């Protein structure tokens, strides 16, 4: 069975594992998912990720991050652009998440960027998701 929205599946797996406080979560690999994991790592939302080659598609193993007392670092993940309704933002319309406390992930002509990076590069694109 094919998956209609693999990015939404990745976000849901992370959200579910985060709620039950798993240390790691495995998602099927793709280039876009690797870039999304890289951004989550750079922004400090996860501890790390590894790409595991299994002879097929590959797996991304994401190490989730928690605070000193076990509180979740990722409090929310929301998919914005969906297969049935794509959401695009020009460089001057890029949304801020929780007034700058979260990030929006944007697919641009210069690759997958955060909202801050896209504003700095002066590019717009498809708003993939919000993370806070």
UniProtKB/Swiss-Prot annotation:
InterPro entries from the xrefs? Ribosomal_uS8, Ribosomal_uS8_CS, Ribosomal_uS8_sf
Q: Which Pfam families match?
A: Ribosomal_S8
Q: Which GO terms describe its molecular function?
A: rRNA binding; structural constituent of ribosome
- List keywords of the entry alphabetically: Ribonucleoprotein, Ribosomal protein, RNA-binding, rRNA-binding
User: What GO cellular component term, any one, is given?
Assistant: ribonucleoprotein complex
A single Gene Ontology biological process assigned to it is:
translation
Family listed: Belongs to the universal ribosomal protein uS8 family.
Q: What does this protein do?
A: One of the primary rRNA binding proteins, it binds directly to 16S rRNA central domain where it helps coordinate assembly of the platform of the 30S subunit.
Kindly provide the name given to this protein in its UniProt entry. Small ribosomal subunit protein uS8
Give the gene that encodes this protein: rpsH
């Amino acid at each position: 069975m094919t998956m209609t929205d693999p990015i939404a599946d990745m976000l849901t797996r992370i959200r579910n594992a985060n709620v039950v406080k798993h240390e790691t979560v495995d998602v099927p690999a793709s280039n876009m998912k690797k870039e999304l994991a890289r951004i989550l790592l750079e922004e400090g939302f996860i501890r790390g990720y590894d790409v595991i080659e299994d002879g097929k598609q590959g797996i991304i193993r994401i190490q989730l991050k928690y605070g000193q007392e076990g509180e979740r670092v990722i409090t929310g993940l929301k998919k914005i652009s969906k297969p049935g309704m794509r959401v695009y933002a020009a460089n001057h319309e890029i949304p801020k998440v929780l007034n700058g406390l979260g990030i929006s992930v944007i697919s641009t002509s210069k690759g997958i960027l955060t909202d801050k990076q896209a504003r700095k590069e002066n590019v717009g694109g498809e708003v993939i998701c919000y993370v806070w």
